[in-house]
Design a protein with these regions (language model features):
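Small-residue-enriched alpha-helical segments and adjacent helix-cap loops
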Residues: 74-207, 211, 306-325
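Flexible, glycine/charged-enriched surface loops at secondary-structure junctions
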Residues: 33-36, 49-54, 102-109, 140-141, ...
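A glycine-rich phosphate-binding loop feature that marks nucleotide/adenosyl-phosphate handling sites
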Residues: 148, 182-190, 258-270, 290-294
Length: 325
């Protein structure tokens, strides 16, 4: 793809290109397998429900909505909003683990439960029995919103971090980005949700305000977040974070995490665009948030209506002939 991202986006919009094959046909110079996944992500963000999904443009994980493991089985991570679950959900998870002989059930660092070792042809049945939405643990999208218990239970909490985390996760579930995105919401500066090393973090401060942080990392590369701004209400926090997420989605390079994106753009510029609305894009960001949220459909519902024949069929083994010497 010979065009930089801003030029590519402008051409795609002008020509109304809504599928990867259409973009490659009109704007590409050669068939490029490596660019397909990035184009698919970009087009889904641009067009929402109008995007024409071609599964051969996506990685195997995205085709079956589960994360393939080294032995060819898959992991299933249901959505638990803000890391909060219920007795009924836990019972169903346990029943599924027994019914399908799941070899490992593991708590994740993002306050979720991972069922590992699921056979491909069991995926639709597992999803149906769980009765929970996809946690998007397999793709470049919003993953988790980690929370502490906040002011509802903790004697140190200065604000309701759990409620904000749940609201954020429900608002932005299914949003896809150039790379995965993880959030954290801490109910006080003790930072039990590790918000200062998330792609987007929120920390409650004295006086009931929320401090919004961006560009953190806690993996192979560790980076403390930059302070974006402070806001007074939960609604303001959700809105500011939405604007940042769309700005990141529209301007980041494919596979560029926020911890690279924010330093590349510069926190002063990011703050100017998001908080001060220096480019006059605030209304655009808000519109894109609502359009993307409206286009959300739980991908695990494909269990009832697969997109293509054999989508969840087990891989067939092929017996090779024995060659005589």
């Amino acid at each position: 793809m010979p065009l930089d991202k801003p030029t590519l986006v402008a051409e795609v919009k002008k020509r109304g290109l809504k599928s990867v094959s259409a973009v490659l046909r009109e704007l590409g110079t050669a068939e490029d397998e490596k660019s397909k996944a990035g184009l698919a992500s970009m087009l889904k963000g641009l067009w929402g429900a109008e995007y024409i999904d071609q599964r051969d443009a996506r990685f195997v994980n995205d085709r079956v909505h589960a994360n393939i493991q080294k032995d060819g089985t898959y992991s299933v991570v249901p959505r638990t909003y803000g890391g909060v679950t219920t007795a009924d959900e836990l019972i169903r998870i346990g029943e599924v683990a027994k019914k399908y002989n799941v070899p490992m059930v593991k708590y994740t660092g993002g306050q979720r439960i991972d069922l590992l070792g699921i056979k491909k042809d069991d995926l639709p049945k597992v999803w149906a029995d769980l009765g929970m939405p996809s946690g998007y643990a397999y793709t470049k999208a919003l993953r988790t919103v980690k929370t502490c218990v906040g002011s509802e239970f903790c004697r140190y909490g200065t604000n309701d971090s759990t409620a904000l985390g749940i609201a954020l996760e429900k608002k932005y579930q299914g949003f896809e980005f150039p790379a995965k995105v993880k959030l954290g919401v801490s109910g006080c500066p003790r930072n039990c949700a590790e918000s200062t090393v998330k792609d987007v973090g929120v920390v409650a401060t004295e006086g009931g305000e929320w401090e919004i942080l961006v560009g953190g990392a806690a993996g192979a590369h560790v980076r403390k977040t930059d302070v974006l701004c402070r806001v007074k209400t939960q609604a303001e926090a959700i809105a500011v974070i939405g604007r940042f997420l769309i700005y990141y989605r529209d301007n980041a390079k494919w596979l560029e995490r926020t911890y690279d994106f924010v330093p590349r753009m510069g926190i002063e510029k990011v703050r100017d665009v998001i908080v001060n609305d220096s480019l006059g894009l605030g209304e655009h960001f808000d519109t894109e948030v609502e359009k993307t949220a409206a286009a959300y459909v739980d991908p695990w519902l494909e269990r009832d209506k697969p997109v293509y024949p054999g989508q969840f069929a087990a891989a067939r083994s092929i017996a090779l002939p024995v060659l005589s010497s």
